Amino acid sequence: LRQPKARISPEQYTRFIKMLWMVTQDEHVGFDVQPRRLGTFAIMCQLIIHAKTLGQALELSSQFYKLFGDEWSVTLERDKHEARLVPLIPKTLDPDHFITESMLMIWHGLASWLIERRLPLERVHFSYPRPAHADEYDALFFAPVMQFVAPRTEITFAADYLDLPIRQDEKTLEEFLKAAPAQLLVK
């Protein structure tokens, strides 16, 4: 952690995040106005696992998290050819963009897991200047286009993916949750 270019493995990151969850008793590890109780993500997953399509699952997930207030949200937008996931997080809660970047990775990883294949991103836009660690984004998002200082932060993919069926079920969800957040990190 003291070396700026050092990397940790997905397994080490998973252990670190789980330790933070236990210490803080907060799935958002202190980055939100109110703690997010442990198990919130699991309940959301139990809700969306019954959706028929990826689009339905992502919309349900978005609606679920809006129940907790307006501080954080992720909105799903769709037009004829493209779909976008747009996180909205107050800059005061996320000055280093850690939560924004984590949310993009988590939602992208969850969508990929639900359809049992990597959801190819067309673009990733960030509303902030290029950070020092931006070279790592290629390994995180695999998007051919990344733009900084964009009007808003969003990930964009082909809208057709929203019509794909959910390929997971309650049994695979149980294993997924035991290992979380590991599967959300590895593409």
Where is each model-derived feature located?
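Beta-rich nucleic-acid/ligand-interaction surfaces
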Residues: L119-D138
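N-terminal low-complexity or simple alpha-helical regulatory segments
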Residues: L1-V86, I99, P131-H133
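Extended mid-to-C-terminal alpha-helical interaction segments
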Residues: A139-K187
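Short hinge/gating elements
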Residues: A42-I48, L88-L93, L162-D163, A182-Q183
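Core beta-strand-centered patch of the WYL/Sm-like small regulatory domain
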Residues: D94-P120
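Short, structured patches in soluble enzyme cores that scaffold and shape functional sites
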Residues: R78, P87-K91, I106, Y128, ...
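Short, well-ordered alpha-helical segments
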Residues: G55, H97-M105, K171, E175
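A generic structural signal for well-ordered coil/turn residues at beta-strand boundaries
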Residues: D70, H81, P120, F142, ...
